[in-house]
From Swiss-Prot:
Belongs to the geminiviridae Rep protein family. It comes from Maize streak virus genotype D (isolate Raw) (MSV). It is found in: Host nucleus; Host cytoplasm. Residues 221-230 are annotated as: Transactivation. Divalent metal cations, possibly Mg(2+) or Mn(2+). A motif (RCR-3) lies at residues 100-103. Its cofactor is Mg(2+); Mn(2+). A divalent metal cation binds at residues 52, 60, 62, 104. Its main location: host cell. Residues 250-272 are annotated as: Disordered. GO terms for cellular component: host cell cytoplasm; host cell nucleus. This is Replication-associated protein A. SUPFAM superfamilies: Origin of replication-binding domain, RBD-like. Residues 175-187 are annotated as: Oligomerization.
């Protein structure tokens, strides 16, 4: 089973999906059409959906959907229909799943052509030598085609190639990570917006002005040992503020005059 209780850990990757909708009274044809549309991008080939009754009389649905390309989703709610959430599984044996769905349906709907699972090369070593032995490439291709999760992929490799597993495990782990990449967890800000908003630019400016850009009399007295009282410190700071303001105004005035003179010089043409 590839479903999970958490969207962050969920990964469904298969061409044969087995769905069970518990407590779902909808008709199989309606559900089948909705599922067919959901997997449209992966080219659906076949779907079968059957309605069965619980012992308490409530209805539930079983469905098998086959696609040309592997359905791949990290959303555990991808197959939800009108609030009905299914159990999602990879159908390792479509033949057995289809037989299970057909066991005692109250209503049934099919669309497309059923695709039996291709014959696997795994586990055929006990057969006689009259049959051609599959190559490593064929076995590996079979594993890649049928594995539905990283643990299952590595387990199949270990069973088929025990020596290679022991000597080249890092390569198989690398390919497993590429075939079944980990789902990135969604970032959650550990410092959500508060009241008042600490990211408010105006609030930051109001704090910077008195705490960073201004020198308090007490801090000035620490830097000037000859200043003994708060009043003297305030007087000195006021004088420094006036002096600084005057110097800034003088610099701006000189810069403005220089700019005007430069502009006048540019207007004069060469002497005749």
């Amino acid at each position: 089973m590839t479903s999970s209780s958490s969207n962050r850990q969920f990964l469904h990757r298969t061409a044969n999906t087995f769905l069970t909708y518990p407590q779902c009274p909808e008709h199989p044809e309606i559900i089948s059409q909705r599922i067919w549309d959901l997997v449209g991008r992966w080219n659906p080939l076949y779907i079968i959906c059957a309605q069965e009754a619980h012992e308490d009389g409530n209805m539930h649905l079983h469905a098998l959907i086959q696609t040309d390309k592997q359905v791949r989703t990290t959303d555990s709610r991808f197959f939800d229909i009108d609030g009905f959430h299914p159990n999602i599984q990879s159908a390792m044996s479509p033949n057995k799943v289809r037989d299970y769905i057909l066991k005692e349906p109250l209503a049934l709907f099919e669309r497309g052509t059923f695709v039996p699972r291709k014959k696997t090369f795994l586990g055929n070593s006990s057969k006689g030598n009259s049959e051609k032995k599959p190559s490593k490439d064929e076995i590996m291709q079979d594993i890649i085609s049928h594995a539905t999760s990283k643990p299952e992929y590595l387990s199949m490799v270990r069973k088929s190639f025990p020596y290679d597993w022991a000597t080249k495990l890092q390569y198989f782990e690398y390919s497993a990570n590429k075939l079944f990449p980990d789902i990135q967890e969604e970032f959650i800000n550990p410092h959500p917006t508060s009241e008042p908003d600490l990211l408010c630019n105006e609030s930051i400016k109001d704090w910077l002005q008195p705490n960073i850009y201004q020198v308090s009399p007490q801090a000035y007295m620490l830097l000037q040992p000859n200043c003994y009282t708060v009043d003297d410190a305030i007087s000195d700071l006021q004088w420094l503020d006036d002096l600084t303001s005057k110097q800034i105004m003088d610099q701006e005035s000189r810069a403005s005059t220089s700019s005007v003179q430069q502009g006048q010089e540019n207007l004069l043409g060469p002497e005749a």
